[in-house]
């Protein structure tokens, strides 16, 4: 074990914590922990226009939810510009950089000319070797790196092998802008050196940047960290991952009902392997992780595998833990809706306006759990799942798990057991209820009312009797009954639901018709 290993995760806070970025963070975390080293976090927020506090918080919360705890204080590049400026001036003094006074308009003119001539554009500044005595005083210069004209740069990548790039293909990149702020290239190199980074593990979309950064390393005389550029994640169709494939933020996967343990396991296997092992705990991942087992081909995002893994991790949780998670989601989302519905009171009891507000809120539901509160009821100040309902959910858990791969699916089914809240009817179940034989439902209510024993066997036998008496198949009468009791067209066994909820609750739901 090498406890001198220091890795870093360095996202730009311009959006959510992307699933590909989360995998990069995971690999850096595991490599550092495997070697008893340090995993550092750096926020690359030099782009003031695009960086947001919300994105920073999304990065923090996403990493914490995944269990990827970092060492030490978070480094913010926006607070380190003086360090970058000093570094640029040092290169200037050592003849490794120069002031460039070429206006941006002239650079763009040259770029356009090269494009028209179908030539690769590399800007060659006329100021590279000019004497400071002729520097203009009316133009604020940038500081550019004096990249060697001859020779080449070799990236020694642990995964990609040796990548050689001719120096003639590398421009004299800007290190310090005219306003005194550092560019990304300078800041990254200075930070990695200052933070003592020993290993850089990142996506291979940074491979081109690596050559330019190596030129800066050489100019400073810094030791170059070990570099590993991993293939990007692709969609199931092999195309570059995009939103249509599921390139969502980690927060979205959390809201979709994935467990952090299962998502980490899935991301780990997305480009890394340990024999035929599919289920890998975080402890095992730390013990086993190495760079030699990384794949060279792009991994494909596969929701079927993700769901299968998540289903496994759901079943590893005990009943109390699962129920607690379900109750938390139910209460959070019910209370979100109550907050939105609360403003309805401003309409002074105007039913038409109230109805309109209610419809808007239904369409605005963003959690995947849509709730329905009749306009006639008085809104509670706060929703809370009762102890009785918690007991129902715990009792039903085995049958709920069989039909669920995510916490969200579990929670949707668990709503069946909220006896103090109105049933939510799917569109299909509404159609079944509207078209069912109302007299048959009344007959079912009468027969179930007479039952003294209300266990699932007794309830099932009673339904068989009713079906036979009406010359119907059991399934024919269970469709409307299921719709009325659950609001769904597919659910756990109605007979089991009946036993758990009891006669009073079942009759109450059947009588809605």
Curated annotation (Swiss-Prot):
Extent of motif 'HIGH' region: 11-21
Q: Per UniProt, where does ATP bind?
A: 243
Q: Which domain of life is it from?
A: Bacteria
NCBIfam families in the cross-refs: gltX_bact (TIGR00464), RPE1 (TIGR01045)
Q: What does the organism's lineage look like at the top? A: Bacteria, Pseudomonadati, Pseudomonadota, Alphaproteobacteria, Rickettsiales
| PANTHER family per record | GLUTAMATE--TRNA LIGASE (PTHR43311), GLUTAMATE--TRNA LIGASE, MITOCHONDRIAL-RELATED (PTHR43311:SF2)
Q: Identify the GO cellular component terms for this protein.
A: cytosol
Query: Which family does this protein fall into?
Result: Belongs to the class-I aminoacyl-tRNA synthetase family. Glutamate--tRNA ligase type 1 subfamily.
Biological process according to GO: glutamyl-tRNA aminoacylation
**Motif location ('KMSKS' region)?**
240-244
Q: Which reaction does it catalyse?
A: tRNA(Glu) + L-glutamate + ATP = L-glutamyl-tRNA(Glu) + AMP + diphosphate
Q: What does this protein do?
A: Catalyzes the attachment of glutamate to tRNA(Glu) in a two-step reaction: glutamate is first activated by ATP to form Glu-AMP and then transferred to the acceptor end of tRNA(Glu).
* Protein name, per record: Glutamate--tRNA ligase 2
Entry EC number(s): 6.1.1.17
Listed InterPro entries: aa-tRNA-synth_I_cd-bd, aa-tRNA-synth_I_codon-bd_sub2, aa_tRNA-synth_I_cd-bd_sf, Glu-tRNA-ligase_bac/mito, Glu/Gln-tRNA-synth, Glu/Gln-tRNA-synth_Ib_cat-dom, GluQ/Sye, GluRS_core
Please describe the quaternary structure of this protein: Monomer.
The compartments listed are: Cytoplasm
- Molecular function GO labels: ATP binding; glutamate-tRNA ligase activity; tRNA binding; zinc ion binding
Q: Which UniProt keywords apply?
A: Aminoacyl-tRNA synthetase, ATP-binding, Cytoplasm, Ligase, Nucleotide-binding, Protein biosynthesis
């Amino acid at each position: 074990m090498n406890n001198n290993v220091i890795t870093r995760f360095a996202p730009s806070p311009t959006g959510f914590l992307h699933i590909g970025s989360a995998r990069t963070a995971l690999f850096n975390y595991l490599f550092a922990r495997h070697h008893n080293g340090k995993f550092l976090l750096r926020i690359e927020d030099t782009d003031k226009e695009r960086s947001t506090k919300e994105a920073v918080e999304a990065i923090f919360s996403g990493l914490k939810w995944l269990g990827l705890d970092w060492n030490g204080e978070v480094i913010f590049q926006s607070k380190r510009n003086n360090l970058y400026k000093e570094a640029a001036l040092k290169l200037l003094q050592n003849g490794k950089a120069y002031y460039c006074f070429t206006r941006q308009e002239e650079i763009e003119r040259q770029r356009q000319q090269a494009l028209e001539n179908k030539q690769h554009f590399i800007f060659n500044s006329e100021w590279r070797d000019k004497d400071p005595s002729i520097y203009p005083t009316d133009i604020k210069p940038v500081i550019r790196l004096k990249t060697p004209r001859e020779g080449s740069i070799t990236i020694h990548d642990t995964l990609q092998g040796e990548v050689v790039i001719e120096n003639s293909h590398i421009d004299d990149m800007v290190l310090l802008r005219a306003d005194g702020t550092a560019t990304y290239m300078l800041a990254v190199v200075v930070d990695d050196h200052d933070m003592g980074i020993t290993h850089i593990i990142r996506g291979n979309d940074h491979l081109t940047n690596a050559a330019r950064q190596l030129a800066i390393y050489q100019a400073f005389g810094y030791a170059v960290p070990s570099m590993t550029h991993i293939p990007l994640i692709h969609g199931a169709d092999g195309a570059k991952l995009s939103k249509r494939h599921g390139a969502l933020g980690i927060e979205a996967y959390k809201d979709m009902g994935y467990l952090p343990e299962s998502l980490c396991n899935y991301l780990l296997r997305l480009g890394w392997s340990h024999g035929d092992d599919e289920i890998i705990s975080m402890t095992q991942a730390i013990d086993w992780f190495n760079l030699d087992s990384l794949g060279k081909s792009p991994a494909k995002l596969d929701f079927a595998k993700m769901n299968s893994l998540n289903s496994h991790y759901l079943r590893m949780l005990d009943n109390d833990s699962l129920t607690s998670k379900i109750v938390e989601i139910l209460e959070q989302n019910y209370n979100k809706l109550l907050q939105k519905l609360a403003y309805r009171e401003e309409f002074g009891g105007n039913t038409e306006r109230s109805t309109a507000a209610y419809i808007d809120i239904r369409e605005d539901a963003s959690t995947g759990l849509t709730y329905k509160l009749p306009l006639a009821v008085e809104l509670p100040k706060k929703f809370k799942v009762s102890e009785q309902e918690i007991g129902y959910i715990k009792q039903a858990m085995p049958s709920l798990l069989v039909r669920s791969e995510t916490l969200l699916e579990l929670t949707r089914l668990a709503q069946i057991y909220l006896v103090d809240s109105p049933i939510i009817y799917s569109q299909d179940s509404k159609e079944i209820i509207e078209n069912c034989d109302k007299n048959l439902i009344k007959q079912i209510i009468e027969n179930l009312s007479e039952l003294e024993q209300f266990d699932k066997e007794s309830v099932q036998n009673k339904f068989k009797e009713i079906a036979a008496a009406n010359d119907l198949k059991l399934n024919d009468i269970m469709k409307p009954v299921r719709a009325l009791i659950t609001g769904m067209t597919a659910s756990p066994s109605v007979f089991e639901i009946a036993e758990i909820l009891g006669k009073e609750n079942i009759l109450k739901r059947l009588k809605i018709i």
